[in-house]
Amino acid sequence: MIIKKIEEILQMQTFGMYYKACYQWAKLFEYIDMAWIYCPESGRCGELDMVADFYLPDQDAYFIVDLGRAGRGYTNCKELSGKLKRLIVLGGPDGGFRVFENGEDYSKVESVLCQCASCGRYFFMNEPGSYECRVCGKYDGDHH
């Protein structure tokens, strides 16, 4: 009986941390004027929409908060990004994030949030990749 109660408390704490992390990421998206849709309540029914926490429509990318969410098991972001040809960002509760794209897993150092010099909008990308803005399409040169 006591073990079950402890498990319930732990589950509430885990999901509480998940919702707090989602809230913090949503606040960041709002602050930098990044368009976002909260997937669990969006009514969208694609494979990524079922596991992702946010869809970033201007970039056609998905964002997954790296904490447990009720009803969601483990998500293999590397495999999913390759299969569906989408950029997936895995964001932690500490503000760190990693980018997965075309089946590649980029380290936190290689995963960046850029601001386009032309349109001023922010977008996620991998550092070895192209610096073409994922919002307006403007190319800002080779920064490698």
Predicted regions and their residues:
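Acidic-and-aromatic substrate-binding clefts and catalytic sites of carbohydrate-active enzymes
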Residues: P40-D49, R69-R72
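Cysteine-rich micro-motifs
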Residues: P128-H143
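Catalytic cores of nucleic-acid endonucleases
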Residues: L67-S118
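Acidic-basic catalytic patches of nuclease active cores, encompassing PD-(D/E)XK
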Residues: M1-P40
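Active-site beta-strand-loop-beta-strand hairpin of nuclease catalytic cores
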Residues: Y31, L48-F63, K78-K83
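Short beta-strand-loop-alpha-helix junction that forms the active-site gateway
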Residues: K5-G16, Y55-N76
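Short, cysteine/histidine-rich loop/knuckle motifs that typically chelate Zn2+
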Residues: C116-R121, R134-K138
